């Protein structure tokens, strides 16, 4: 099978399901914000964010390359579109690629927030209203697939 098929958004249609794919790492756009937080509170660098994790080790986790998942969805004919989430679910250029007349709704209550992002949020250094517009909350890619 030829895997060089371009992923575009022409196949996305009303009723498709949008699935957020988990990433363990933070995006490169998050580092400047975290650096400002650490400049204000250097003690956070070695802080324990939950029973098992420290901030520094969580910051060092790599983002996921979704190659296997994307290729599998393409091979089955299920992939209608996909975009990488940089910075934020809300401020993502991928939403602009939806076909004319289609819109997406993100239910933030359905996203299980990783301990790293919960910890950063609880530091309350950038404001609760701003936080979801600056961090991807652990969703690294969104794929559009048939709802059934």
Language-model features, listed with the residues they occupy:
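Glycine-rich anion-binding loops of enzyme active sites
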Residues: 1-31
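Short, solvent-exposed coil/turn linker segments
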Residues: 2-3, 25, 43-44, 54-55, ...
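Generic structural "secondary-structure junction" signal
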Residues: 3, 9, 28, 40, ...
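Surface-exposed beta-strand edges and their flanking turn/coil or helix-capping segments
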Residues: 8-10, 32-36, 95-97, 118-121
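Secondary-structure boundary elements
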Residues: 10-13, 40, 75-77
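Short, surface-exposed linear patches
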Residues: 16-22, 40-44, 104-106
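Glycine-rich, acidic
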Residues: 26-72
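Glycine-/charge-enriched secondary-structure boundary and capping motifs
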Residues: 52-58, 64-148
């Amino acid at each position: 099978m030829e895997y060089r098929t371009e992923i575009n958004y022409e196949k996305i249609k009303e009723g498709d399901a949008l699935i957020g794919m988990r990433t363990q790492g933070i995006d490169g756009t998050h580092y400047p914000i975290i650096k400002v937080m650490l400049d204000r509170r250097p003690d956070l660098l070695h802080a324990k964010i939950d029973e098992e994790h420290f901030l520094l080790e969580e910051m060092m986790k790599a983002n996921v390359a979704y190659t296997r998942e994307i290729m599998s969805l393409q091979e089955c004919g299920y992939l209608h579109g996909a975009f990488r989430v940089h910075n934020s679910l809300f401020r993502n250029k991928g939403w602009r690629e939806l076909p004319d007349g289609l819109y997406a709704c993100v239910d933030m209550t359905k996203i299980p927030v990783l301990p790293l992002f919960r910890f950063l949020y609880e530091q309350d250094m950038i404001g609760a209203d701003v936080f979801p517009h600056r961090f991807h909350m652990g969703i690294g890619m969104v794929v559009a697939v048939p709802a059934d």
